[in-house]
C-alpha cells in the first residue's frame, strides 16, 4: 500500500516541520 509507505517515509518530515 503506497499510503503505508508514505506514512512511514513522511513521518520524519512531519517531525522535522513540528
From Swiss-Prot:
It holds the Pfam family Pigment_DH. Transmembrane segments: none annotated. It is found in: Secreted. GO terms for molecular function: hormone activity. The keyword Secreted applies. The modification Alanine amide is found at residue 18. GO terms for biological process: chemical synaptic transmission; response to light stimulus. It comes from the Eukaryota. Keywords: Amidation, Hormone, Neurotransmitter, Secreted. GO terms for cellular component: extracellular region; synapse. InterPro entries: Pigment_DH. Belongs to the arthropod PDH family. Causes the migration of the distal retinal pigment into the proximal end of the pigment chromatophore cells and thus decreases the amount of light entering the retinulas. May also function as a neurotransmitter and/or neuromodulator. This is Pigment-dispersing hormone. The lineage of its organism: Eukaryota, Metazoa, Ecdysozoa, Arthropoda, Crustacea.
